[in-house]
Amino acid sequence: MKLLILTCLVATALARHKFHLGHLKLTQEQPESSEQEILKERKLLRFVQTVPLELREEYVNELNRQRELLREKENEEIKGTRNEVTEEHVLADRETEASISSSSEEIVPSSTKQKYVPREDLAYQPYVQQQLLRMKERYQIQEREPMRVVNQELAQLYLQPFEQPYQLDAYLPAPWYYTPEVMQYVLSPLFYDLVTPSAFESAEKTDVIPEWLKN
């Protein structure tokens, strides 16, 4: 037991010593790296200052061109990915439409079989349609005929002149209208009626009473 405890203590002491040494190394390396970077920047500045302006401009232009090329490549890649995505969507839509159309075609033949019409019926259909059109025309003509008759009668009434209330035929002719020869025939029955005795006078003279007076 004592040996185990001693070994554990020794191991912990060694580990602490190693950790302390490593931390010191890192702290020493970090300032060295920062100092190296500062030295590099200074060297670049000196080199840039020694380079003429034309070379600087060319260098800057090349850098800008490289940046533009990189941007164009990125844009092309983005467009390519978008086109691929759209093509995938289009293909998926077409596949769904094809599946729907195939399913509908499977359903439609059963209905078309039920609705099959022979050729004879198809040839007879235009004749039936013509007959129906003729029947409709006749019916329309029959409906219009009474209206035409009424309109014609009204037109005749409007066109006919008003009759005069004092026509010569409405009254008996005056005696001076006829000639003397005609007046003989016209006046003779009147005088005959005045001369002939009535039924009462003949009955008184003959003393014969008619039967209808007896009652």
Swiss-Prot record:
It is found in: Secreted. The modification Phosphoserine is found at residues 33, 99, 101-104, 111. Mammary gland specific. Secreted in milk. The keyword Aminoacyl-tRNA synthetase does not apply. Keywords: Milk protein, Phosphoprotein, Secreted, Signal. Its main location: secreted. One of its GO terms (cellular component) is extracellular space. Residues 1-15 form the signal peptide. It holds the Pfam family Casein. Belongs to the alpha-casein family. Important role in the capacity of milk to transport calcium phosphate. This is Alpha-S1-casein.
